[in-house]
């Protein structure tokens, strides 16, 4: 029983860094997506301020 608890404890200690890395990686991916959306919106906003219509802005900004 004692060796089983030791094995489980070691397994948990090995998995914690992997889960931590996955969490940090997921947050950075979310940040990149937010940046892409913000940049795209900025493009549309600038396009509209320049007096272009929606169709032209969509072709220019993607």
Curated annotation (Swiss-Prot):
Record carries keyword Signal: yes
Endpoints of the signal sequence: 1-26
InterPro entries: Toxin_25
Keyword Disulfide bond: yes
Gene Ontology cellular component list: extracellular region
Annotated site residue numbers, Aromatic residue of the functional dyad: 44
Chain residues in the propeptide: 27-38
Family, as annotated: Belongs to the short scorpion toxin superfamily. Potassium channel inhibitor kappa-KTx family. Kappa-KTx 1 subfamily.
Protein name (database record): Potassium channel toxin kappa-KTx 1.4
């Amino acid at each position: 029983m004692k060796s089983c608890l030791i094995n489980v404890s070691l397994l948990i200690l090995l998995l914690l860094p992997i889960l931590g890395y996955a969490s940090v990686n997921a947050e950075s991916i979310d940040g990149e997506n937010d940046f892409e959306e913000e940049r795209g919106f900025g493009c549309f906003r600038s396009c509209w301020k320049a007096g272009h219509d929606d169709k032209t802005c969509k072709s220019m900004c993607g």
